[in-house]
């Protein structure tokens, strides 16, 4: 991205991304755990808020991309469970599965674990972008 857009262009794109995601996190009581350079890990008080936030993020980027010179494509992976918190970071199978789902997602796609699908599958069916 930096090679294509230059340092300034890449920073502007990251700021646009982070602005959208941070607004959505705030709306659903989400908390950024860490920025991974090309994405971020977040945690929510409950899985419903995580699902609703993911859908809002997807919609916000869809809207952003309709008017953007440089579109931003996102991938989201969701799992539900109790991660282990240590040194301001999260660990455990929930975190690992969410990361794997994110890595497997196509651009602009939300992939969820079986647990999330079982608990909130209807929410996704009702909110297709």
Language-model features: locations:
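Residues that scaffold the ATP/ADP-binding catalytic core of kinase and kinase-like folds
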Residues: 1, 43, 86, 119-120
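A short beta-strand->alpha-helix segment at the C-terminal rim
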Residues: 64-66, 74-82, 103-129
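Charged helix-capping and loop-helix junction motifs
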Residues: 91-96
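Catalytic NTP-binding/metal-coordinating core of nucleotidyl cyclase/transferase enzymes
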Residues: 1-53, 60
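Catalytic strand-loop-helix junctions within cyclic-nucleotide turnover domains
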Residues: 43-48, 77-90, 107
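Active-site phosphate/pyrophosphate- and oxyanion-stabilizing loops and adjacent acidic/basic residues
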Residues: 55, 99-100, 118
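Helix-adjacent hinge/juxtasegments
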Residues: 49, 58-68, 72-74
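Short, intrinsically disordered, mixed-charge
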Residues: 56-59, 103
């Amino acid at each position: 991205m930096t090679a294509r857009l230059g340092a300034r262009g890449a920073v502007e794109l990251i700021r646009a991304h982070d602005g959208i995601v941070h607004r959505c996190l705030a709306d659903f009581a989400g908390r950024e755990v860490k920025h991974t350079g090309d994405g971020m890990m977040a945690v929510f008080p409950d899985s419903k808020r995580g699902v609703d936030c993911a859908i809002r993020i997807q919609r916000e980027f869809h809207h952003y991309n309709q008017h953007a010179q440089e579109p931003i494509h996102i991938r989201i992976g969701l799992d539900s469970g109790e991660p282990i918190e240590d040194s301001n970071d999260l660990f455990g199978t929930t975190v690992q599965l969410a990361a794997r789902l994110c890595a497997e997602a196509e651009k602009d796609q939300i992939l969820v674990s079986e647990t999330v699908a079982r608990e909130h599958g209807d929410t996704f069916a009702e909110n297709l972008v």
